[in-house]
Amino acid sequence: MAPISRETDFLVIGGGSGGIATARAAAGKYGIKSMVVEGKRLGGTCVNVGCVPKKVTFYAALVAETIHQAKDYGFSVEQTAPFDWPTFKQKRDAYVARLNGIYERNLANDKVEYVHGWAKLLSPNSVEVTLDDGTKSVVNAKKILIAVGGNPTIPPHIPGSEYGTNSDGFFDIDTLPKKVALVGAGYIAVEFAGMLNALGVETHLFIRHDTFLRSFDPMIQQVSVKEYERIGVKVHKKSQLTSVQKDAAGKLAINFKEGEGEQSISDVDHLIWAVGRTPAVEGLGLDKAGVKTNEKGYIEVDEYQNTSTENIYAVGDVCGQVELTPVAIAAGRKLAARLFGPEEFRTLKLNYDNVPSVVFAHPEIGSIGLTEPEAVAKYGAENLKIYKSSFTAMYYAMMKPEDKAPTAYKLICAGPEEKVVGLHIIGLGSGEILQGFGVAVNMGATKADFDNCVAIHPTSAEELVTLK
């Protein structure tokens, strides 16, 4: 490996989506001498243990569902048994490895210096980099970006919790399990539960309340929980794990409270914790540079991604704002433009309102803007008009009633002009549907604008422009 530079204009700590996007914009677009330091694989959580391998697994689950449904369309298709998880995992891992290589080549193409190692702040303008061979180098930088992301957590207070794995460990599972327990009520737990269930795994999902995805609109919560129970996910409501035991064969016994009673399930192959993430700031030397964090350990930033220390910035999950890959990328690119671009970009910043988000559940969920309770709190119920529709997508027309998944849409409109301030959808294709409607909501579209768009028939999405 060539010696690393001792001086740079822009040093990025963290080679995930946000860090790489910012460094590439700085170097490739504005000609700034830039360096990225990353101790793991390039691409961060999203590429390696998040969005990308998760979506590939989601597609595998969709194929399994399609095979099951094929007979309703006249195909005599046998379920391929057993599902070849090892081959699937090998191909998924190879795809991720290709992306790692693409990220590295993209950095090289934009003339960003990439250093595989661990960075630690020594001062507001200097960083100690520990390379793979243990040697250390000090790099002085005019500006520093912290984009180190976060790590999934495992609760330490539950006896035997260490026998479980976190969401990262899910992608290391070598064989398709027969029985899995997941703990959590957010994106990750819900997505994993849906995928595993579709692949034929007995799936237990432990949640603390009556619904999951509790930051989403109540309609989404209610419809999705009911559907998960219908398709066979064992949702343990108002539950709390009390202990975990592991037998000589490696099987787990999960002890838990559900409602008022004590219960347990045995012969569990994997326990997956999906109970939140913490910022990856340990050992980063934030105190040496005077970078402040909040009570949860997230780096404090203002609306321009400035930290408490001049010339040190932060983007992505380490800030604890909207923890989504495209948000980190967008914030990073705007930061690069503000710092290194022309004068008219000096006040550029990311607007964190109306960020679209999708849960690759079964069925998919899409959401942008305010939930109904949030809209009531902001505008008052008397100033809102709520449009709702529930129906069965045409895809299910050939199937028996008990095999039909739901579709439910909601538009939340505010004021006399009926500006669309919230849009929430659950049903087939919601992830793809939401992107275009997200543009409309961000442009300030009204209900009349939606109505004036000619429907595309027959589609599920046409319902959003024909709501009454």
UniProtKB/Swiss-Prot annotation:
Chain sites annotated for binding glutathione: 17, 24, 103, 333, 410
State the needed cofactors, names only. Answer: FAD
Task: Give the cofactor binding note.
Answer: Binds 1 FAD per subunit.
Supply the SUPFAM superfamilies for this chain: FAD/NAD(P)-binding domain, FAD/NAD-linked reductases, dimerisation (C-terminal) domain
| Record keyword Disulfide bond present | yes
Please list the residues that make up the active site: 457 (proton acceptor)
Asked whether the UniProt record includes Membrane among its keywords, one would answer: no
Q: List the disulfide bonds.
A: 46-51
Binding residue positions for NADP(+): 185, 188, 191, 208, 214, 276, 323, 358
Coarse class of the protein's main subcellular location: cytoplasm
Give one GO biological process term: glutathione metabolic process
Instruction: List residues binding FAD.
Output: 17-18, 38, 45-46, 54, 119, 317, 325, 457
E.C. numbers: 1.8.1.7
- InterPro entries xref list: FAD/NAD-bd_sf, FAD/NAD-binding_dom, FAD/NAD-linked_Rdtase_dimer_sf, Glutathione_Rdtase_euk/bac, GSHR/TRXR-like, Pyr_nuc-diS_OxRdtase, Pyr_nucl-diS_OxRdtase_dimer, Pyr_OxRdtase_I_AS
Q: Which GO terms describe its molecular function?
A: flavin adenine dinucleotide binding; glutathione-disulfide reductase (NADPH) activity; NADP binding
> Which reaction does this enzyme catalyse, per its entry?
2 glutathione + NADP(+) = glutathione disulfide + NADPH + H(+)
Entry superkingdom: Eukaryota
Q: Which GO terms describe its cellular component?
A: cytosol; mitochondrion
Q: Which UniProt keywords apply?
A: Cytoplasm, Disulfide bond, FAD, Flavoprotein, Mitochondrion, NADP, Oxidoreductase, Redox-active center
**Annotated compartments:** Cytoplasm; Mitochondrion
Query: Miscellaneous notes for this chain?
Result: The active site is a redox-active disulfide bond.
Protein task:
Catalyzes the reduction of glutathione disulfide (GSSG) to reduced glutathione (GSH). Constitutes the major mechanism to maintain a high GSH:GSSG ratio in the cytosol.
Report the family membership: Belongs to the class-I pyridine nucleotide-disulfide oxidoreductase family.
How does the record describe its quaternary structure?
Answer: Homodimer.
Its recorded name reads Glutathione reductase
Report the gene name: gtr-1
